[in-house]
């Protein structure tokens, strides 16, 4: 009797959960194409005593497997207290997210401007070509922001256009000829240069694009700023807070906050979801996969082990018969500012080795479905009919049902008791512990 072939995604999950006897290849940190370590994957665009701006390397330069992310970049911004990132615009859409600290974000339009007080968890889309500036008004706390950039002119590349002329860069106004500037401003070039450019007075130029502010300047800027919307997540053009509503998944071991394109116009325009996840030390975000979204995971605080399961690409051979599927495990130890990419349909699991918080951008997010492979709720394996379970698994349907019911938690579980037990038996590495924690 011929056995029925089971859908590939469930096979992947089955292999991941039950260690089905197939060939398994493991790729660790540095050979992992989905892992971008903070220490060697970011390029510093600007840095002085007031802060820095860093740009993550292009995803498709890291690996051809990330080609579908060629149009996206990750930007990290940090600034000291009482500072401002000077006015500029870029040929890219930005989705800005506040990781820690406070900020005043001002968006400048042709005939108006809008200023907003931002707090941790606040997000805001900045459309391409919008002039904006960013203040850290706090007296003691640093500001930390992550931005997803989507360039509009060149795939994977964008430019910042600063109005100010500093020691770090020229004002884009300096690109125009003198007579054009004189006609445009109806003034002599000497006056334009003295007031706006300072080409011959370098000693008066700022040291860079992040500069200090006085207490009085901050007080004036703060007076004009509005608070972000914490009552609604559906704002079309104002900041919204990712963590202001109840988490979509929550128990004693973790919390999962998310806003999808269906709930927010700014995210709908970009086809992106935003997630912020807290996991307690020693706990596990259970194995699951996203149906169509590619997830860019950024570690904000803490450390974690992550395991991702895919199918190894088969080599072209002259033989006509099919090769057996070879499962490949990608594993990495993640820490603050590290980035990890999770392709659509690839099952993965996150084990927090300290209290953990990470942010996730979901690309191609509309109508994405999250499918858990273990746990009591939202478990795709539990929805498979008994007759099909008999064909798909070596155990009986009763055995499968009994196994799946052993895990009474959902979404997050405590892996520490299992890890201690495995440690006492002399086993090494996180994978056996992760498997044992599931059932």
Curated annotation (Swiss-Prot):
Compartmental location: Vacuole, Aleurone grain; Endoplasmic reticulum; Protein storage vacuole
The keyword Nucleotide-binding appears for this protein: no
SMART domains, A to Z: Cupin_1
Cellular component annotations (GO), alphabetically ordered: aleurone grain; endoplasmic reticulum; protein storage vacuole
Principal localisation: other
CDD domains for the chain: cupin_7S_vicilin-like_C, cupin_7S_vicilin-like_N
InterPro entries, per database record: Cupin_1 (IPR006045), RmlC-like_jellyroll (IPR014710), RmlC_Cupin_sf (IPR011051), Seed_Storage-Functional (IPR050253)
Region (Necessary for sorting to protein storage vacuole): 430-439
Top-level lineage group: Eukaryota
Domain (Cupin type-1): residue spans on this chain: 34-193, 240-401
Function: Seed storage protein. Accumulates during seed development and is hydrolyzed after germination to provide a carbon and nitrogen source for the developing seedling.
PANTHER family membership: OS03G0336100 PROTEIN-RELATED, VICILIN C72
Subunit structure: The alpha-, alpha'-, and beta-subunits associate in various combinations to form trimeric proteins.
Protein name, entry field: Beta-conglycinin beta subunit 2
Gene: CG-4
């Amino acid at each position: 009797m011929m056995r029925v072939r089971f859908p590939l995604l469930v096979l992947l999950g089955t292999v991941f959960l039950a260690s089905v006897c197939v060939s398994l290849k493991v790729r660790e940190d540095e050979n992992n194409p989905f892992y971008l370590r903070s220490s060697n994957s970011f390029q510093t665009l600007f840095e002085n005593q007031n802060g820095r701006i860093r740009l993550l390397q292009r995803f498709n330069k890291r690996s051809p497997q990330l080609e579908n992310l060629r149009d996206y970049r990750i930007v990290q911004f940090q600034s000291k207290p009482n500072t401002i990132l000077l006015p500029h615009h870029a040929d890219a859409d930005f989705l800005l997210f506040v990781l820690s600290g406070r900020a005043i974000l001002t968006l400048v339009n042709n005939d108006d401007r809008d200023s907003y007080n931002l707090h941790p968890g606040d997000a805001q889309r900045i459309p391409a070509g919008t002039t904006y500036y960013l203040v850290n008004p706090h007296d003691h706390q640093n500001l930390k922001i992550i931005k997803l950039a989507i360039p509009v002119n060149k795939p994977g590349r964008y430019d910042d256009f600063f109005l100010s002329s500093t020691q770090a860069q020229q004002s884009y106004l300096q690109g125009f000829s003198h007579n054009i500037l004189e006609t445009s401003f109806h003034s002599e070039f000497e006056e334009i240069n003295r007031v706006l450019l300072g080409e011959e007075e370098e000693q008066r130029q700022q040291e860079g694009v992040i500069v200090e502010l006085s207490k009085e300047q901050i007080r004036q800027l703060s007076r004009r700023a509005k608070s972000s919307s914490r009552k609604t997540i559906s704002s079309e053009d104002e900041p919204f807070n990712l963590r202001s509503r109840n988490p979509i998944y929550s128990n004693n071991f973790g919390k999962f906050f998310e806003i999808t394109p269906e709930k927010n116009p700014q995210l709908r325009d970009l086809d992106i979801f935003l997630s912020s996840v807290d996991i307690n030390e020693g706990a596990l975000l259970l194995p699951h996969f996203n149906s169509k979204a590619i997830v860019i995971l950024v570690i904000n605080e803490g450390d974690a082990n992550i395991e991702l399961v895919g199918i190894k690409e088969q080599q072209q051979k002259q033989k006509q018969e099919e090769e057996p599927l070879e499962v490949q495990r990608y594993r990495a130890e993640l820490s603050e500012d590290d980035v990890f990419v999770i392709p659509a349909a690839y099952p993965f699991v996150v084990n927090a080795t300290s209290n953990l918080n990470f942010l996730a951008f979901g690309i191609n997010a509309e109508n994405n479905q999250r499918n858990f492979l273990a746990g009591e709720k939202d478990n795709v394996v539990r929805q498979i009919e008994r007759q099909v379970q008999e064909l798909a698994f070596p155990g009986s349907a009763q055995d499968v049902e009994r196994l799946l019911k052993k895990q009474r938690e959902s979404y997050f579980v405590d892996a520490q008791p299992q890890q201690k037990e495995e440690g006492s038996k002399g086993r090494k590495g996180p994978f056996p512990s992760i498997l044992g924690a599931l059932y």
